[in-house]
Regions:
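Periplasmic-binding protein-like
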Residues: 223-233, 274-298
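Extracytoplasmic ligand-binding site segments that recognize negatively charged/polar headgroups
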Residues: 58-62, 105-111, 115-248
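N-terminal secretory signal peptides
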Residues: 1-21
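Conserved C-terminal helix/tail region of periplasmic/extracytoplasmic solute-binding proteins
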Residues: 359-392
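N-terminal export leaders
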Residues: 18-35
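Mature extracytoplasmic/periplasmic domains
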Residues: 296-366
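Early extracytoplasmic/lumenal segment of secretory-pathway proteins
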Residues: 47-113
Length: 392
C-alpha cells in the first residue's frame, strides 16, 4: 500500500508548517526561547484566558482560536515553545515558564521526568468527558501516564516513514533502501537523533536481527550499535546529506537530488503539488509513531486555573479543533468527534476529507509501530553520539 492512490486530504491546507520547523527559527536567534520573558505576569492576564505554550504546529491561527473561544468558553493565548524538548524542560525546571504558562503541548516522552520533578500535574479525566472518545490505542501510549495517572492528553498522533520517488526507486517497503549501496549518494536522513536513530534501530531490529529491545529508548550498548552503523555509512558516503528543516527536505526531493529518504509526510503532498510522482512508503519493519500531548503545568494549578485548563483539554477533543488542525497541518486529533463535527458543519469542513484523514492515520497504527521518545533514558548519550556523527 502506498499513498499514491489516496486522494489528498490536505488539498485545502493553508500552511505546511511542520512540528520541527520552529526549531529552525529558534536557531536564528533567541526569540523562540525568550518570548515568555517579555510577557505580563500571569496574574495580569484575563481570568478566562489560558496561556497555551506549545509547538507551533498546534496553533490554529487567530481566526481559529476565535471560533474555539466562542464554542468552548476558553480564550487561548498561544505561544510557540520552539518544539525542542530540551529547552522546554529547562525553562520549566529552572526558568519562569511555570510562572507564565498554564498548559503545554509537547512531543511525548517528557511527561515522566516533568511529573517526577513536580513541574506538571495529573489530569482529572472526570473533568474531560471527551476523553472517552479518544481512540483506545492512543490512550494506551506509554508516554502519557506515570504511576497510574494520566499526565498527557493525546492531542495529535501520526506515524512517519520514507518519502520515495516512484520513477527512481519503484515501490519500496523497507528502510534497507536507505542503506543500499546501489543508491549511494541518493538517500538521506534528518539531522536529528529523535527521528533518525529510531528509524535505524527499527531497521536493524527487524531486518538485521540486531538485539534491540525498544527502538525508541535504546540502552547504551544498543545506541552504540546503531550509531556505529550510521557513522560507517556516512563515512562510506551513503547519504546525500543529513537534512535540516522543512525547506531543505522538500528541495532535496523536489530537485530529485535524493530519491528516497526518511522524513515527514507533508513533504509528500508538497512534492506532489510540484508534479512529482512521490509517495509515502509502508515499511515492513514498522512506522515511527509520535504524539503531541497536552500537559497541565503546575503553575496553573497553583493559580486556581485547573478547571479552566481542563475545559481547554476537553475542547481540544470536541471536534472543531481536530477539523481545523487537520485542514491546516494534515495531522489528526485522535477522536471520531472530528468527523461528527464536520458532518454537522459541512459548510466549514468537508466530512469526507476529515474522515479520510482519520482513516489514513488509523490504518498506519493498525500495523507495526514503534514510539518515538523525545526524552529517552540515555538522552544525553544520544546527544553525544549525534555530535560524533556530525563530526565524522
Amino acid at each position: 500500500m502506498t499513498l499514491n492512490g489516496l486522494s489528498n486530504p490536505l488539498s485545502r491546507i493553508r500552511s505546511l508548517l511542520t512540528r520541527r520547523q520552529l526549531v529552525q527559527r529558534a536557531a536564528l536567534g533567541a526569540g523562540a526561547l525568550a518570548v515568555g520573558t517579555l510577557r505580563l505576569p500571569r496574574a495580569a492576564q484575563a481570568a478566562n484566558e489560558i496561556n497555551f505554550w506549545a509547538s507551533g504546529t498546534l496553533d490554529i491561527g487567530d481566526d481559529g482560536w476565535k471560533i474555539f473561544a466562542n464554542e468552548s468558553g476558553v480564550k487561548v493565548d498561544f505561544t510557540d515553545n520552539g518544539n525542542d524538548p530540551g529547552p522546554v524542560v529547562a525553562r520549566l525546571a529552572a526558568g519562569n515558564a511555570n510562572d507564565i504558562y498554564d498548559v503545554g503541548g509537547l512531543d511525548g516522552g517528557t511527561e515522566k521526568e516533568l511529573a517526577k520533578r513536580g513541574l506538571i500535574a495529573p489530569w482529572d479525566l472526570g473533568q474531560i468527558p471527551n476523553y472517552s472518545s479518544v481512540w483506545e490505542w492512543a490512550k494506551d501510549i506509554p508516554h502519557s501516564t506515570f504511576e497510574g495517572r494520566v499526565y498527557g492528553i493525546p492531542t495529535v498522533v501520526n506515524a512517519d516513514s520514507m518519502i520515495a520517488l516512484r520513477n527512481r526507486v519503484g515501490t519500496v517497503d523497507s528502510y534497507g533502501v536507505i542503506f543500499d549501496r546501489k543508491l549511494r549518494g541518493k538517500t538521506a536522513m534528518e539531522d536529528a537523533w529523535i527521528n533518525s536513530v529510531i528509524f535505524t534501530a527499527i531497521y536493524l531490529k527487524n531486518s538485521e536481527n540486531a538485539k534491540i529491545s525498544e527502538p525508541g529508548d535504546l540502552t547504551a550498548d544498543e545506541l552504540g550499535l546503531v550509531m556505529e552503523f550510521l557513522i560507517k555509512h556516512k563515512k562510506d558516503r551513503q547519504f546525500r546529506t543529513f537534512w535540516n528543516g522543512w525547506e531543505q527536505g522538500l528541495q532535496l526531493v523536489a530537485n530529485q537530488e535524493v530519491w528516497v529518504m526518511t522524513g515527514w509526510e507533508p513533504i509528500v503532498y508538497a512534492a506532489r503539488r510540484r508534479g512529482l510522482d512521490c509517495y509515502y512508503a509502508v515499511p515492513k519493519e514498522g512506522y515511527e509513531a509520535w504524539i503531541y500531548n497536552t500537559i497541565l503545568l503546575k503553575g496553573a494549578v497553583d493559580r486556581g486555573l485547573s478547571m479552566k485548563a481542563h475545559q481547554l483539554a476537553n475542547a481540544f477533543l470536541s471536534g472543531f479543533y481536530g477539523c481545523k488542525l487537520g485542514m491546516l497541518r494534515g495531522y489528526a486529533v485522535p477522536t471520531d468527534n472530528n468527523v461528527a463535527y464536520a458532518t454537522a458543519h459541512a459548510r466549514a469542513f468537508d466530512p469526507a476529507a476529515v474522515k479520510e484523514l482519520s482513516e489514513h492515520v488509523k490504518a498506519k497504527f493498525a500495523g507495526k509501530v514503534y514510539w518515538q521518545n523525545a526524552r529517552p533514558a540515555n538522552f544525553q548519550l544520544y546527544e553525544q553520539w549525534w555530535q560524533r556523527l556530525r563530526n565524522a
